[in-house]
Amino acid sequence: MERDNRDEDIMMRGTKQEMPGFRFRLLRPEKKRELWNPDFELLFLLRGRGRVSYEDGEVHNLPMGSIFAINRFQICDLDLDEDGLALSLCVSAETIASFHIKLLKCEVKCQSFFYMEDQQEKFDLIRRDMARIFLEMYKNNEEQPIYMKSRVTALLEDLLSYLSLIHI
């Protein structure tokens, strides 16, 4: 377990971890995430298994590789198994509004755990988008904020294009 934590620290070292309007964070079992926040959040279960519980009482088991969205102000509890590790990307309402105002008026239904392995294509695209944003953080050049914003824009466009949205 100690070795795994060192690997995670190495993974996050060298990144700026926060850019204006969006940020990454690693979630571990011992550190609980807040039940709600004003940001849109996309979570990717990197290791282990977990459970997600929603305010309406729904509880879902999460296999490794699950990706799912937590909409703004949505109450949601995440429990990770002892060896669980999740990557969270939070995008502020202001950032979303500057890219896609339509997304602020919708609830994104991104829950890969509802689909079989042969139905993961659209979620693989979202996983790839998220990985590209994360990798962009490692680049150390003056255009980094521009590239990061373009990657976040691509992710938001893919969410709008490929996943069901409920207008609120």
PLM-predicted stretches and their roles:
Residues E41-F44, L125-R132, R151, L155-D158:
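Amphipathic, well-ordered alpha-helical segments in soluble domains
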Residues I166-I168:
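Conserved small/polar residues in nucleotide/adenosyl-binding loops
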Residues A69, K105-E107, L125, Y147-R151:
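Hydrophobic, helix-rich cores of sensory/ligand-binding and other regulatory modules
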Residues L62-I75:
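Conserved metal-binding segment of the jelly-roll/cupin
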Residues V52, M137, L156-L163:
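Hydrophobic recognition helices of helix-based DNA-binding modules
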